[in-house]
From Swiss-Prot:
This is Caltractin. InterPro entries: CALM/Myosin/TropC-like (IPR050230), EF-hand-dom_pair (IPR011992), EF_Hand_1_Ca_BS (IPR018247), EF_hand_dom (IPR002048), RNA-helicase_DEAD-box_CS (IPR000629). Ca(2+) 1 binds at residues 37, 39, 41, 43, 48. GO terms for cellular component: myosin II complex. GO terms for molecular function: calcium ion binding. Residues 1-25 are annotated as: Disordered. Ca(2+) 2 binds at residues 73, 75, 77, 79, 84. Keywords: Calcium, Cell cycle, Cell division, Metal-binding, Mitosis, Repeat.
Amino acid sequence: MSYRKAASARRDKAKTRSAGLTEEQKQEIREAFDLFDTDGSGTIDAKELKVAMRALGFEPKKEEIKKMIADIDKDGSGTIDFEEFLQMMTAKMGERDSREEIMKAFRLFDDDETGKISFKNLKRVAKELGENMTDEELQEMIDEADRDGDGEVNEEEFFRIMKKTSLF
């Protein structure tokens, strides 16, 4: 591989790591990182990561933080530099955006605003979309998504089933 191709490949890789973020989002991520890099070392640790993510509007669980650090902290230093943080938050921002899209779709189904998608809601949407589905097929869809067994699909169940389909 020529030097030019190698340099171009490196630039493309760097671009895709934070691709899809606006300059404003990148700046927001940089500010959160800098705020918690109190000693100016260019790195933050696990505790600081949790606080920085909260500042960006996420509520990470302890297990999620541990997994994120393990995935990113390849040298085992227990710290994350800005590039690693940017990469991680780019993925998180994408998740946040797709979650918002999925919740918009949920609200289209939940026209009676109960916080759940009922058989009646699903039947109405299928009819509006011109889908010729039997009641049995519609009930199977509800049953597939319904994890708590209440006969309806709540936001979390809807989110989970939509993520499974890879549409979002």
